[in-house]
Amino acid sequence: MSYAGINKGTTLLTAAMLLGATRAGAADALRAELSESQPELRDPYARSIPDMYPKAYRWAPEMEEIVEFLGDDPAARLIFQGMAALCRRLAADQVGEQAEVRSLDVFIARLTEPT
């Protein structure tokens, strides 16, 4: 449970923040900051986030299992409840409009463009 929480949780946290930056009109600023301060994360993001799309429907129940695993830690439980909700939303988006998937793809494509 701990490994899944760290590995998948990191991917989901990143996706949530990329979507948030895009909705807030801050995608370009975030891309610039990541490119300058964390260039080593470009390739892992470019791989892990798109790889997550077709698995999101499976990840939601896994995040809920992690919620139970965390036991009496309300703050940690809330984090993974939110990640389960994000998984369900991304799974629905993938078979629906794909607006969020497209937003993530655009962010990642621009992040990995040569500078």
Name each model-derived stretch.
Residues 99-115:
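Short, basic/aromatic-enriched C-terminal tail that caps enzymatic domains
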Residues 1-100:
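Helical "substrate-binding/catalytic lid" subdomain
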